[in-house]
């Protein structure tokens, strides 16, 4: 399978990346099948070979997450929401709602218990 990934080059702590097409089993900085673009994260400079990228994508090449973000930013791919992210966000929202409901329920129970205790202590003192 062909992957579209970033190949690191440059000095220490001054990395730049080439967007390349390569076999999925090859090393990160191994020899690519084709160079398709350039990305510098410090200056946010991005150069993409749009035609070559369209050809590779039509052949079934799979972009990594970082490359997918660059392609979406460059207008070569439509912005997609991954199902796992959506499900995770829905679960988090449901958990938050459940926690709020539980907190409200606990507060109501504590208030009722405090009211019952004050009523009980008031009746005990009048009887004594």
Swiss-Prot record:
GO terms for cellular component: cytoplasm; small ribosomal subunit. SUPFAM superfamilies: Ribosomal protein S16 (SSF54565). Residues 117-128 have a biased composition (Acidic residues). It comes from the Bacteria. GO terms for biological process: translation. Keywords: Ribonucleoprotein, Ribosomal protein. GO terms for molecular function: structural constituent of ribosome. InterPro entries: Ribosomal_bS16 (IPR000307), Ribosomal_bS16_CS (IPR020592), Ribosomal_bS16_dom_sf (IPR023803). Residues 107-128 are annotated as: Disordered. Belongs to the bacterial ribosomal protein bS16 family. HAMAP family: Ribosomal_bS16. This is Small ribosomal subunit protein bS16.
